[in-house]
């Protein structure tokens, strides 16, 4: 009998959710839903996935500080890529729910080994339909699809 072994090499990514929401003192349930969905979708795409704790930020300086922490964790955890995902929420006169509305997502992808930023993109004019149960999961799936395209373009 002949046995053959196939070795699979999956890329390891580490991501970090950074929430921008002036009306929230803690990471919101919406951000946690997105974090969970991003983690699961990357796993389904075949990546080895880790993440830093979701955090709140109110400035670009704080974003950069969190970025350095997250990219350091990715490097120390032997990840191939670090992805910072910034979620932007706002309350307007049209906000119908108790929580703020997600209106923009920005992501930055960097090599965890070299620190070189390889992609950055902003998804704007997001429409969260709170009457649909899985709307945030769909937004997350679309986000992961965009990130995956950028990773594939960089041979991930």
Which stretches of residues belong to each language-model region?
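Short intrinsically disordered, low-complexity segments
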Residues: 9-10, 76
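C-terminal/domain-edge helix-coil "capping" segments
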Residues: 10-14, 34-37, 41-44, 92-94, ...
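A structural detector for beta-sheet-dominated domains
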Residues: 16-18, 86-88, 126
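N-terminal segment of the mature soluble domain
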Residues: 17, 22-83
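Residues at the C-termini of beta-strands that transition into short coil/loop
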Residues: 53, 86, 113
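Charged, amphipathic alpha-helical segments
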Residues: 79-94
């Amino acid at each position: 009998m002949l046995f053959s072994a196939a070795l699979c090499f999956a890329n390891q990514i580490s991501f970090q959710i950074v929430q921008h929401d002036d009306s929230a003192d803690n990471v919101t349930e919406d951000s946690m839903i997105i974090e969970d969905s991003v983690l699961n979708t990357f796993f389904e795409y075949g990546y080895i996935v880790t993440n830093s704790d979701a955090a709140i930020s109110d400035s670009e300086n704080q974003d950069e500080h969190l970025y350095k922490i997250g990219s350091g964790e990715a490097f120390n955890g032997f990840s191939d890529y670090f992805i910072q995902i910034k979620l932007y929420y706002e309350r307007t006169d049209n906000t119908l729910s108790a929580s703020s509305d997600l209106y923009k997502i920005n992501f930055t992808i960097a090599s965890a080994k070299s620190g070189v930023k390889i992609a950055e993109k902003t998804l704007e004019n997001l429409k969260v339909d709170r009457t649909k149960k899985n709307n945030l999961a769909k937004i997350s799936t679309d986000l992961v699809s965009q990130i995956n395209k950028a990773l594939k373009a960089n041979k991930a």
